[in-house]
Amino acid sequence: PLRLVGSEMCIRDRAKPTEIETRQIYEARKAIENSVIMILVQKHQNNELDLRGIDSLVKKEKSLHQDTDNAKLARLSCDFHLSLAELCDNKFIVESLKPLIPLSALAASIYADNESNFCSFTEHFELIEAIKSNDLVKASKAINSHLDRCVESLDFNLKATKNHNNSHLFN
């Protein structure tokens, strides 16, 4: 379980990462997820990687995106990134990434720009295809571009005045 209570991101009993913290969260994710991609491309080259479960997640993401079920979509997007890490068979990578995923989802729920047409399932699909192509450079560009777009889709000028119910991010 994720604990935000002891972190400095709590303001009046409500978690709210700042712009700088959000950018740092994504910077840390890039460092970890680039390692994930490197391992997965190598495993795929050695025929040691089964991506059927990940393919299924992306298909579910696409169908939920069309139904606009944001809570389930957010959960699936989190599951996608953690599932990729789990395919590395390295508990330290998974445990390093685990707290960052919900923190980035929390930031997205606070700073979401409703004008943005960001669509993660297409980038998730492109990332999987890059891994399947055994092209590490292409796969690294795909994950970096995806995480950069996640940050670019946020509007840090928004005032977080709504009482966000973010419980779905931590279930």
Task: For the regions a language model picked out, list residue spans one by one.
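C-terminal effector-binding regulatory domain of bacterial HTH transcription factors
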Residues: 137-171
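Short coil/turn linkers that connect adjacent helices within long alpha-helical scaffolds
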Residues: 9, 66-68, 113
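Charge-rich, acidic-biased intrinsically disordered regions
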Residues: 51, 103, 108, 133, ...
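Single conserved hydrophobic/aromatic residue that forms the stacking wall/gate
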Residues: 1-6, 10-11
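Active-site loop of classical SDR/Rossmann-like NAD(P)-dependent oxidoreductases
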Residues: 116-118
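Minor-groove-contacting beta-hairpin "wing" of winged helix-turn-helix DNA-binding domains
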Residues: 12-16
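Conserved amphipathic alpha-helical segments that form helical-bundle/coiled-coil interaction surfaces
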Residues: 20, 25, 29, 37, ...
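Short amphipathic alpha-helical signal-transduction/dimerization elements
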Residues: 36-37, 41, 132, 151
